[in-house]
Design a protein with these regions (language model features):
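Glycine-rich segments within core transmembrane alpha-helices of 12-TM secondary carriers
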Residues: 139-164, 425-438
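C-terminal ends and interior cores of transmembrane alpha-helices
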Residues: 90-103, 370-384
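C-terminal membrane-cytosol helix-exit motif in multi-pass small-molecule transporters
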Residues: 182-204, 231-244, 259-278, 461-470
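Cytoplasmic membrane-interface "Motif A"-like loop-to-helix N-cap segments
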Residues: 78-89, 356-369
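Intracellular juxtamembrane helix-capping segments at the cytosolic ends
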Residues: 120-134, 402-416
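Extracytoplasmic
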Residues: 17-51, 67, 72, 156, ...
């Protein structure tokens, strides 16, 4: 494979302009989504919250992200990223203002629950960037989008406490979070005005039907149904964590009601997927339009172990340093752990660039193997380690984790152009499923075993990646007049 150099400061190039305005949109969604995190100590004191109530807020913040990434992916494919991203930014801004204005714990909980939709913003830009960049550049472009946008969570952690301090008073945190909401809302208006879904003269391909992926064989239909099950199981696990046997935010009736709703929703989704696929599967899909669903499944599972482990480790790493090394303050432990998130700025683009340069499957295989080794090394860290060496090991592991994420989304746009939003949404949802599963494991084991479980699961994923086909040749999409357009994926 070959790549062409991206001139990132050539704002006269429409695709470079699109990349910058889109990664910044994603950046703002993450600032808003994680705006509560650095303020939790202040919020806990202001509302006199218990530790279980704080934990419940953190769970609620991610509860809707799994289904919302699927929903947002479908909306992107149907309406286009410009409209969906701008709308999400404006709604997310209003939710942030609502959270900042909350007067009771119940209001805080509702707003954090709704914030899960904001976490789906990542999916939108994947489709937008893929429309503007050719296959030989899409890896690094998606990596820049994902890496720089993902930095929004770290930016929130670094800036919002200072902004709250500048406002001063007991309500400083409210002004800081509310201000981010206003900025997101205004940028949503700007994005709608200046963004375009495709380059001039290009066609924005859409699925024939909406509500589920179009698969091209009966075997893939059942494979697709099976791949939906873990997402519902993860939501059931989140419900269990909020139930009386754990945090107690939900009573038995509410918990059982949610379990029943999840079963009903799964049945409805099965019927919807059948409706989307029954006609063209009965007629037979032309060879030129076929793709293998295993490509989607492998990418989902790869994102499970990459992004899923990142979310889980970022959540526990400060406490890991604090508990492992005596004499560290909470602030020092947080700073040492921050190196894991900072790697996003360079690691994701590097993963995408390597994928463009040396091959998709080879890159993903090497990075997941490195990830496995990295977590096995972290499992050996104890109080006898030199702290700088522990930090270096953490950052090295983080590089493979986040470069792996970049490699996954270098491939996502090359499966089926018209369904890129849905494919990205499903992969993104699996990332959150991974976080739920890994954090659930952590609640039962010690730190060393936790890291070893991630490393062992990465070995399994490495083996599964070998079954993925290297994207090659061209994919076919149907123009509105019925003619076929071939899109290069090499």
């Amino acid at each position: 494979m070959s790549t062409e150099k991206l001139h990132l400061f050539n704002f006269g190039d429409p695709k470079i302009k699109t990349l910058h305005i889109t990664w910044f949109a994603f950046f703002l969604t993450f600032v808003v989504w994680f705006s509560h995190a650095p303020m939790m100590a202040i919020i806990k004191e202001a509302f006199d919250l218990s530790t279980p109530q704080i934990k419940a807020l953190l769970i609620l913040n991610v509860a809707l992200t799994i289904p919302s990434r699927i929903v947002i992916g479908t909306l992107v494919d149907k309406y286009g990223p410009r409209l969906v991203f701008s709308t999400l930014l404006m709604i997310g801004g209003l939710i942030a203002v609502g959270f900042a204005s909350a007067q009771t714990y119940e209001q805080l909980a509702v707003m954090r629950f709704l914030s899960g939709f904001i976490g789906a913003g990542f999916v939108i830009g994947i489709r937008m960037v893929s429309e503007w960049f050719p296959a030989k550049q899409v890896g690094i472009a998606e990596g820049i989008y994902g890496g720089w946008g993902n930095f929004g969570s770290a930016a929130a952690a670094m800036s919002l406490p200072t902004i709250a301090l500048l406002y001063g008073g007991d309500d400083g945190w409210r002004y800081a979070i509310g201000m981010m909401g206003v900025i997101a809302f205004l940028y949503g208006i700007i994005y709608r005005r200046i963004a375009k879904d495709t380059p001039k003269g290009s066609t924005y391909f859409k699925p024939k039907k909406h509500g589920g992926l179009e698969v091209t064989s009966k075997a893939d239909f059942y494979f697709y149904l099976a791949m939906n099950v873990p997402m519902y199981l993860a939501l059931a696990v989140l419900t269990w964590k909020l139930s009386p046997v754990n945090l107690g935010l939900l009573n038995d009736m509410a918990s059982n009601g949610i379990y029943l709703i999840l079963v009903v929703l799964f049945i409805v989704q099965v019927r919807t997927i059948h409706h989307v696929n029954k006609e063209h599967l009965a007629q037979g899909v032309p060879e030129i339009q076929r793709y293998k669903f295993k490509q989607v499944a492998v990418l989902d599972i790869a994102y499970f172990v990459t992004f899923g482990s990142e979310l889980a480790v970022v959540s526990m790493l400060p406490l890991f340093f604090l508990d492992t090394f005596e004499g560290l303050s909470a602030v020092q432990a947080g700073l040492l752990a921050s190196g894991f998130a900072f790697m996003n700025l360079v690691a994701r683009p590097t993963g995408g660039h390597l994928s463009d340069s040396i091959g998709r499957r080879k890159t993903l295989s090497v990075l997941i193997a490195g990830l496995a080794v990295g977590y096995f090394v972290l499992s050996q860290i104890d109080a006898d380690w030199w702290i700088p060496l522990a930090v270096i090991a953490t950052m090295a592991c983080s590089f493979f984790v986040q470069a792996g994420e970049g490699a996954v989304f270098a491939i996502v746009p090359l499966v089926q152009r018209r369904m890129t939003g849905q494919i990205a949404g499903m992969a993104g949802a699996y990332g959150n499923v991974g976080a739920v599963i890994y954090l659930t494991v952590l609640s039962f084991v010690d730190y060393s075993t936790f890291f070893m479980v991630i490393g062992a699961s990465a070995i399994l994923v490495f083996m599964l990646v070998q079954f993925m086909d290297e994207p090659s040749g061209k994919m076919a999409e149907i123009l509105p007049d019925g003619t076929v357009q071939l899109i290069d994926v090499e």
